[in-house]
């Protein structure tokens, strides 16, 4: 077919089309990298009219979002977190981005009672002095700033998957284990 019109443009990445509401002439999509002050890997849900007008971010800033939309595109469940926050699930109105209700906030009380501490997110400049590099630092739970610790640079340089977790997931603790060793 022929291109009718461009719907989005900009120096950011569309990750996934979540839903096309043909009746309302709206597309919902996950994208990252729009906010230059935020980790560029945090996915956010947006809506935009099929003619390219009315672009609106529907999810909270500065979190990684995983969303599931209802079949009628009226609501979505937003599971959001970072590696240094407690995961939360909310029901959101898809037209406005307004919270309808909190569905669940994870209970970390036993983790914290056992000494768990969140990792630290950081941003540094690359050697070019321009490019921002984002990372996560895991420290021993009994970290002592007067001691010297080895650094483990946990990198996966392949194109298939990132080695860094952005939301708090079941995989997050595996990196914590290295810091505790």
Model-predicted segments: where are they?
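Short regulatory "switch" loops immediately downstream of catalytic or recognition motifs
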Residues: 30-33, 140
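Serine-hydrolase catalytic core recognition
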Residues: 24, 64-181
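Short, solvent-exposed loop/turn segments at conserved positions within beta-propeller repeat blades
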Residues: 36-41, 82-85
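Multi-bladed beta-propeller domains
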Residues: 1-23, 32-37, 48-65, 94-118, ...
């Amino acid at each position: 077919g022929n291109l009718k019109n461009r719907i989005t443009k900009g120096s950011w990445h569309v990750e996934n089309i979540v839903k096309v509401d043909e009746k309302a002439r709206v597309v919902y999509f996950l994208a990252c990298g729009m906010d230059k002050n935020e980790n560029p890997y945090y996915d956010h849900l947006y809506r935009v009219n099929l003619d390219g007008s009315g672009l609106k971010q529907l999810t909270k800033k500065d979190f990684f979002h995983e969303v599931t939309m209802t079949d009628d595109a009226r609501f979505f469940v937003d599971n959001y977190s970072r590696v240094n926050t407690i995961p939360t699930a909310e029901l959101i109105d898809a037209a406005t981005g307004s919270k309808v209700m909190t569905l669940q906030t994870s209970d970390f009380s036993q983790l914290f009672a056992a000494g768990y501490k969140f990792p630290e997110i950081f941003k540094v400049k690359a050697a070019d002095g321009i490019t921002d590099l984002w990372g996560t630092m895991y420290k021993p739970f009994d970290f002592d700033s007067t001691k010297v610790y080895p650094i483990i640079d946990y990198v996966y340089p392949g194109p298939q998957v990132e080695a860094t977790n952005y939301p708090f997931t079941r995989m997050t603790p595996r990196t914590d284990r290295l810091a505790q060793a």
